[in-house]
Swiss-Prot record:
This is Ubiquitin-conjugating enzyme E2 11. The keyword Disulfide bond does not apply. Pathway: Protein modification; protein ubiquitination. It comes from Arabidopsis thaliana (Mouse-ear cress). Interacts with the E3 ubiquitin-protein ligases MBR1 and MBR2. It is an enzyme of class 2 (transferase). It catalyses: S-ubiquitinyl-[E1 ubiquitin-activating enzyme]-L-cysteine + [E2 ubiquitin-conjugating enzyme]-L-cysteine = [E1 ubiquitin-activating enzyme]-L-cysteine + S-ubiquitinyl-[E2 ubiquitin-conjugating enzyme]-L-cysteine.
């Protein structure tokens, strides 16, 4: 069941990839993918290339995939282990969602952080109180870690 669904999503992704994103299996393992997300142009992550690891559970799509950043990123909703605080990867997951929608949600999280549900409270605090310092720090991390 899971592998059929994952194959279908892979075909759909290859046919109609979400903008600024790509994803596919690592080697022969259909349950482990790597995705690439380009930093959204209107964000401090612009120009960066962010690698994201996706692990599908055996009961996918009834359980959400485990998605984490491999590239270091300065963001209130993404911690130093690469964990992402995103409702659709937790309690708001639905079998109707796809990896394509997950990647788009992560892109929009890069553009519009959610400082009211932070994974890294000190970055959220800076985002709320000193936006320009947040943006310059995020930009310098992007240059340091996400640009080849």
């Amino acid at each position: 069941m899971a592998s059929k669904r994952i194959l279908k999503e892979l075909k759909d992704l290859q046919k109609d990839p979400p903008s600024n994103c790509s994803a596919g299996p690592v080697a022969e393992d259909m349950f482990h993918w790597q995705a690439t997300i380009m930093g959204p142009p209107e964000s401090p992550y612009a120009g960066g290339v962010f690698l994201v690891s996706i692990h599908f559970p055996p009961d996918y799509p009834f359980k959400p995939p485990k998605v984490s950043f491999k590239t270091k990123v300065y963001h209130p909703n993404i911690n130093s282990n690469g964990s992402i605080c995103l409702d659709i990867l937790k309690e708001q997951w639905s079998p109707a969602l796809t990896i394509s929608k997950v990647l788009l949600s992560i892109c929009s999280l890069l553009t519009d952080p959610n400082p009211d549900d932070p994974l890294v409270p000190e970055i959220a605090h800076m985002y709320k109180t000193d936006r320009s310092k947040y943006e310059s720090t995020a930009r310098s991390w992007t240059q340091k870690y996400a640009m080849g």
